[in-house]
Each structure stands twice: as C-alpha cells, then as structure tokens.
Amino acid sequence: MEFVFYACSLIAVISTLLVIIQKNAVYSLLYLIISLLSISGIFFIFGAFFAGALEVVIYAGAIIVLFVFVIMMLNLGKKNDLQEKKYLNPIFWIGPSFLSLILFLLMTYAIFFVKDKQIYFSLIDVKEVGINLFGPYLLLVELSSLLLLSALVVVFHIGKEKK
C-alpha cells in the first residue's frame, strides 16, 4: 500500500506543478482534476472513504464545473478558436491522459490486489450522506454554499458584456 501512496503523491505533485506551469486555462483544469483525484486516492488509502468521496464529488465535480463556466464566460473570440484547433494535436492531451491512466491503474491495483488494507464497498443512500453532512457540519456546508453562490455572482458580473 505504500507504493500506491507514493505513486498517488507523486502524481499529485506533478499534476499540481503542471497546473501552475500550464499557460492554457483548460489544460490547467485538466491537470487540476488529476491532482484532486490523486488526493482523493490518498484519502482512500488512509481509510477516509467519506472524505475521498467528497473530494471527488465536491472538488473534482462541482468546483471544476464552476471553473469551466468561468472560462466559457470569458469568450476569448476567434483567435482562441484557432488556437483550440491547434490544441487537438495529441501532444497537448497525452500528458493528462497518461497521468490519468497511471492513477486508474494504481487505484485498480489497490482495490483488487492489496489484501491487507483492501477497500470494501458498501452502498449508502442519499439520506445517510445528508445526515452526515447536515448534522455536525451544517454551518460549514451553508458557508461553502454561500461562498460558491457569491463566486457565481462575481463571475457573472465580470463576464457580462458591456453595452
């Protein structure tokens, strides 16, 4: 299990560095998704399954979608469209794909072949997730929802065209 931990940590560090280095915002978001998924893998390794699942759902899901909306609202014009055609070249998407493949293989190895700390699946329903979130963490959930709402309002205000 140590090998999986170090591999997930290495992928998290590499992809986070690529988030900082990358000049295009969309590819930076791809590397950010890989970084967040590898961090959730580390949560799963340490046995914090709920925190790992929340990492995937909240950060890699909702917040990344919000970032994509910001990029879409910027609307960089025809120059950006020509540059996006250039980005269809495999050299631009091979890096995120390779890191995602390594992360997928590591998680598959950890789930099926590591016997001493194997991840066991258990189904929980939405009611249990709601009770766990809105029980002791009600204030944190409400504050984070207000933060996301205010970020959405700011993005809308910045992205709105002036007439």
Swiss-Prot record:
Broad enzyme group: translocase
Keyword Membrane on entry: yes
GO molecular function, one term: quinone binding
Catalytic activity: a quinone + NADH + 5 H(+)(in) = a quinol + NAD(+) + 4 H(+)(out)
Gene3D superfamilies assigned to the protein according to its UniProt record, in alphabetical order: NADH-ubiquinone/plastoquinone oxidoreductase chain 6, subunit NuoJ (1.20.120.1200)
Compartments, as annotated in UniProt: Cell membrane
GO CC, alphabetical: plasma membrane
Bilayer-crossing regions: 1-21, 30-50, 54-74, 94-114, 138-158
EC number: 7.1.1.-
Keyword terms of this UniProt record: Cell membrane, Membrane, NAD, Quinone, Translocase, Transmembrane, Transmembrane helix
Function field: NDH-1 shuttles electrons from NADH, via FMN and iron-sulfur (Fe-S) centers, to quinones in the respiratory chain. Couples the redox reaction to proton translocation (for every two electrons transferred, four hydrogen ions are translocated across the cytoplasmic membrane), and thus conserves the redox energy in a proton gradient.
Assembly with partners or alone: Composed of 13 different subunits. Subunits NuoA, H, J, K, L, M, N constitute the membrane sector of the complex.
Protein name in the entry: NADH-quinone oxidoreductase subunit J
Organism from which the protein derives: Buchnera aphidicola subsp. Schizaphis graminum (strain Sg)
